[in-house]
A protein has these predicted regions:
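C-terminal/domain-edge helix-coil "capping" segments
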Residues: 15-40, 140-279, 297-303, 316-387
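Amphipathic beta-strand/beta-sheet edge segments enriched in Tyr/Trp
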Residues: 107-148
Length: 387
């Protein structure tokens, strides 16, 4: 009786409904400020390359480090471009690290990205250390996002970036102009304190909750402050040059990455379909083999034994078919791995020309920025000693 139930349960089904997800292709509108923001109150934004999230993956995830590294930069740059279109901010830059002092910081982690679904954990805080947002964003896209016939070059996951931008703007609009100006002042004082702690340490203090507050302000004609502002202008020059690098990188990888993501989407959907079909076929095959063996053992007639043999043979065919479909799914995933490797050439080190020097990015961008910071510190001390 139990065997009969098993054979009944594992009989292959022909219907495959419910495998593909239904998604919306409607573009989410990007919000703009409710009222114009004065230039002096426009906050600068720094977006660090996202954490690749590789430490959160397991052996079953089809994740390739070289792709995730590229995505970490690409996604940050995509968010920057979306936020720029809102007209609600000052300079929006992808920065090498959160060591770059700015008014608003955006960081995050890639939790999932396979061409079909993207999940990001995003954190936003300001120069005071006050957290604005800590939220998980998720979007699942459909096959039409990759339909070449639609000639749609928009990012398939643009809605996710728009939602992040809208949420950040929503928090920004809760701030008064005075509070925004205070944030900009704190950013300047933090930068000044970094280069001359003995001169600027007393101007800002840390409250019990860990956020910063202004104790008092230096004179506008303070010579040390004026030198620090010149140093900060040079820092902006470097960061803007780095933004050109990030923009160029994103443009270079865009078409190749969209092809990769389209293939990844198709592979993920196909692999899921094959995996589900394969599981049913494998279990059905095992059940049919057991039924055939059980029937041969219990049958006392030739006809019964022949029927049982046929049942077992059918079960063997179904089992083989199921395993072949699983192997086919693995082949699709392997194809994604090959495409991921092809992106390595587009994240090679580049040479950046500055006004009076050339910076070669042979290591990490963060490492290069640390060298730049050390150079600025040296320039500041030389200029201060010359006065």
């Amino acid at each position: 009786v139990l065997l009969g139930l098993l054979v009944s349960v594992v009989t292959p089904q022909t219907a495959t409904a419910g495998i593909d997800k239904v998604t919306s292709s409607t573009a989410l509108p990007l919000k703009t400020p409710f009222a114009p923001i004065a230039d002096a109150a426009l906050l600068d934004v720094g977006i660090t390359p996202l954490n690749d999230g590789l430490d959160l993956t397991d052996e079953d995830d089809t994740v390739f480090p070289e792709v995730r590294f590229a995505e970490a930069i690409y996604f940050s740059n995509q968010l920057a471009k979306v936020m720029e279109k809102s007209g609600a901010w000052g300079a929006i830059r992808v920065t090498p690290s959160d060591d770059v002092i700015t008014d608003v910081y955006i960081s995050g982690t890639i939790l999932h990205s396979d061409g079909e679904t993207m999940t990001l954990q995003i954190t936003v805080k300001d120069s005071r250390g006050q957290q604005w947002i800590s939220k998980k964003y998720n979007q699942t896209t459909g096959k039409y996002a990759y339909d070449r016939r639609l000639k749609n070059l928009a990012d398939p996951f643009r809605n996710l970036f728009v939602q992040i931008a809208n949420d950040i703007l929503k928090y920004r609009e809760k701030l008064s102009q005075e509070k925004a100006l205070e944030l900009r002042t704190i950013s300047e004082l933090r930068f000044a304190r970094h280069f001359s702690p003995e001169a600027f340490d007393e101007y800002i203090a840390e409250k019990r909750d860990g956020t910063l507050t202004i104790e008092r302000l230096p004179a506008e004609n303070d010579k040390i402050l004026q030198r620090v502002r010149k140093i900060r202008d040079r820092d902006y020059l470097y960061i803007d040059t780095m933004q050109d690098y990030y923009d160029g990188f994103s443009q270079q990888m865009h078409l190749a990455y969209q092809d990769f993501r389209r293939s990844s989407y198709e592979s993920v959907v196909k692999a899921r379909q094959l995996d589900q079909q394969g599981n049913r076929r494998v279990v059905a095959g095992i059940g049919a083999i057991l039924a055939g063996i059980y029937g041969r053992t219990e049958s006392n007639t030739r006809i019964g034994r022949d029927a049982s043999t046929a049942t077992a043979a059918t079960g063997g065919f179904i089992l083989k078919s199921g395993l072949e479909k699983k192997q086919q799914a693995a082949t699709y995933n392997e194809a994604v791995a090959e495409m991921g490797s092809s992106l390595e050439a587009e994240i090679a080190p580049q040479v950046i020309e500055l006004e009076d020097r050339t910076v070669t990015l042979t290591g990490t961008v963060q490492g290069q920025y640390e060298q730049w910071q050390a150079l600025l510190d040296k320039i500041y001390k030389q200029e201060r000693g010359a006065l």
